[in-house]
C-alpha cells in the first residue's frame, strides 16, 4: 500500500503593486500608469534679476561712471571715461536711450542705439590707447579738432567724445568726397569697433564752419558692408544735453565692426567726425533684456522671469531668451517613469489540476514589497510571504538614472550644439529674428519630448528583462528542490516560509537546508505490516505466486469465451 501526501509550496517572481499610480507618456503605448515618476519640468514665477552664480554679470557698462548712460560710455563722453569690467553675461537695461548727455545726436538715422548693446555682447571690452586716424592731417585738411561747450570735460571746459574728432577745416572751402583708411589697431585679435559720424547745422553755421552750405555725402565700408548718408541742413530747434549749452546743430553717429587685420574706409565731405579711439572687444556673449539693480545670485537669467535657480532640466510657460545654467523650454510638462508599470494587487486563482495555473505577478502586483520593485512570493500553509530583490531593484533604478543622464547629455551636448549653431548665426546678423528663435525652441522641445517618450518606453519594457533575470536566478538557486510550472512560478519539494524567501531574495538560499526528508514535497510511505515471522523473500514469493495464478486463470477464461463464440466448443450447464 502506498500513500502520497503534498507538503509543497509555490514560489513566484513578480513586481510590486501600488495604490497611487501616476501617468507617463510613451512612444508606442501612449499614456501608461506607473508606480512612480520623476517630474522633469517646472513652471517658474517672475523674480528680480540677479548676478549669475560664479560669474560677473554686467548691468551698466561702466559701474563706476556716475550719472552716465551706457551710450555716453560707448561714445566716450568726457565725464564718462572708465574701465569696463569683463563679464560672462550682460543685461540690456536701456532699450532706447533718449540722449547722449553731450552733443545732440540724431539717434534714428543710424543704428547708434545698438552700440551699447553690441559692446555688452562681448566678455572683454577695452578702449584703445592710441587713435586710429590723425584728424589734423587727414585728407582735405589741415583741420582743427573742434570741441563744444555742450560736451564739457572733467574740468568743465569744452570737450568732445573720445571716440571721434570733429574735423573743422582751416580753409573754409567746399570739397569733393575724400577717403581716409581706417587701419586695424587692436593688438589681441579682438573685434575692432570703430565709431565715426558727421555734423550738420543750418546754412549760416555750415558756411561759417566749413565754407559750404550744401548737403554733404558720407560713406563707410568695412567687412563688405557699405553705408551711405547725406547730411540734413537746418531745421533743428536749439537743444541742450545735460549740463551743455543749447545747440542748433546735430550730429549723426555710426559705427563699423572690423575683424582682425581688416581695413575700413570712410569717404566724406565737410563736417566729418573722424574716428579716434576704438573699442577692442573679444569673447562673444549673449545679451538679454532685463532691469537693474541685480539682487543676489541665480543659476539663470530669463527675460520673462528674471533670476531663476535651476531645479529641473526643463520648464514650461513663456519662452524667451535666457543666459546661464538654464532649464530648456518645452511645450508640455514631462515626467520620467520612476518605478514599474502599475498593477493592481494580485488575486490567486484556485488550482486547476495538480499543476494548475496560478494568477501570480503576471496578472497583478504583490503588496508589501516596500523595500523594492521586483522580488519573490511564496504561497502555502503559512499564507503568502513577500520579499524584495534589492539587486534587481537597484538595476532598474540604475537604468532610470542612466536615462536621466542620457537626457542630461542630450540637453548639454546635442541641444546646445543646435543652439550654438543658431548663436553663430546670431553673431553674424547681430539680431536673430524672433520667429527663427521660436522655431528653434519648438524644434528643441520636440526633440526633448521624443527623448522622454523613448526613455519611458525603455524603462517600462525593461520590466520583462528584470523578471526573466529573476526567474533564471530563482531557478538556479532552487535547483532540483523545485519544479518549474510556468508564469515565473516553481513548485517546491519543501516548505518555504518568510525566512526561506528572505534568503532567496538575499541570494543566500541553500537548498540543502530545506532538502528531503525534512520538507519532502511528496512523502512516499510504505504501509505498516504486522511482524508474523515471515521474511522478505517469503512475502515476495507469495506475491509472485498469486500474481502468476491470476494471470493464467484470466488467459484460460479468455480462450474459452473465444472458442464458444466460434461454435468450436459447446458448453452445457446442468443443475
Curated annotation (Swiss-Prot):
Signal peptide segment: none
Lipidation residue positions, type S-palmitoyl cysteine: 571, 574
Cytoplasmic side: 565-575
Keywords recorded for this protein, A-Z: Disulfide bond, Fusion of virus membrane with host endosomal membrane, Fusion of virus membrane with host membrane, Glycoprotein, Hemagglutinin, Host cell membrane, Host membrane, Host-virus interaction, Lipoprotein, Membrane, Palmitate, Transmembrane, Transmembrane helix, Viral attachment to host cell, Viral envelope protein, Viral penetration into host cytoplasm, Virion, Virus endocytosis by host, Virus entry into host cell
Residue ranges, Extracellular side: 1-543
S-S bonds: 12-489, 68-80, 102-151, 496-500
Keyword Cell division tagged: no
Alphabetical list of InterPro entries matching this protein: Capsid_hemagglutn (IPR008980), Hemagglutn_HA1_a/b_dom_sf (IPR013828), Hemagglutn_influenz_A/B (IPR001364), Hemagglutn_influenz_B (IPR000386)
Transmembrane region(s): 544-564
Glycosylation sites noted in the Swiss-Prot or TrEMBL record: 33, 67, 131, 153, 171, 309, 338, 497, 523, 536
One Gene Ontology term of the molecular function aspect: host cell surface receptor binding
GO CC terms, sorted: host cell plasma membrane; membrane; viral envelope; virion membrane
Pfam name, any one: Hemagglutinin
Post-translational modification (record): Palmitoylated.
Location within or outside the cell: Virion membrane; Host apical cell membrane
Membrane topology: Single-pass type I membrane protein
Swiss-Prot/TrEMBL site (Cleavage) positions: 352-353
Biological processes, Gene Ontology terms: endocytosis involved in viral entry into host cell; fusion of virus membrane with host endosome membrane; fusion of virus membrane with host plasma membrane; virion attachment to host cell
Oligomeric form and interacting partners: Homotrimer of disulfide-linked HA1-HA2.
Described function: Binds to sialic acid-containing receptors on the cell surface, bringing about the attachment of the virus particle to the cell. Plays a major role in the determination of host range restriction and virulence. Class I viral fusion protein. Responsible for penetration of the virus into the cell cytoplasm by mediating the fusion of the membrane of the endocytosed virus particle with the endosomal membrane. Low pH in endosomes induce an irreversible conformational change in HA2, releasing the fusion hydrophobic peptide. Several trimers are required to form a competent fusion pore.
Family: Belongs to the influenza viruses hemagglutinin family.
Miscellaneous comment: Major glycoprotein, comprises over 80% of the envelope proteins present in virus particle.
Record-given protein name: Hemagglutinin
